[in-house]
Amino acid sequence: MTDSFGFAEEALEQEVDLENNPTARVEELKARVLKENVNDPEDIMLLIMESFTIQEIVPEAGKFYTFIYNAKTPNISYDQHPLIACVEIFRWGFRGLNFHWQNYRNYTWEEIPGQLMVVEFQELDELLALQYGKFILNN
């Protein structure tokens, strides 16, 4: 069952102290970013792809994901590395709350060149702190 925002209730009910209980893969990722002095969004996304090995082809409403996206619509700005909460699935793709944009966005299947990396609720703040969103104007 989902609430009016499209999130699974159990995801919203989780109360996790992110500072004291981050997942091991995020700690490893943060350590690599610091050790390798990585600050380019492309390079950070590559490290995320190496660390986040649980992947899905089709998202599930109420779950969190990050992935690479190449928009087809001309003259729009888009995030090439979205971090989203999936809220709806359609034949053409899905809709998600993009945490980098802080807005709902539509994602079509054809514009996702790979798979969606599953993100756990308790990893969201840590990933947002990495600032790996890559905002592009599609010409």
What annotation goes with each model-predicted range?
Residues N70-K72, I89, L124:
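Generic structural motif
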Residues E15, E19-A61:
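Mixed-charge, Lys/Arg-rich low-complexity intrinsically disordered regions
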Residues S77-Y107:
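Basic/aromatic-rich interaction segments and small domains that mediate binding to polyanionic partners
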Residues F5-F7, L12, L18:
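Hydrophobic/aromatic hotspots within intrinsically disordered, low-complexity regions
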Residues M45-L46, A71, S77-D79:
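Catalytic phosphate/metal-binding cores of nucleic-acid and nucleotide-processing enzymes, i.e., regions
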Residues N98-N139:
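Intrinsically disordered, low-complexity, charged/polar segments
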Residues Q55-N75:
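Short coil-to-beta transition motif at edge beta-strands of beta-rich domains
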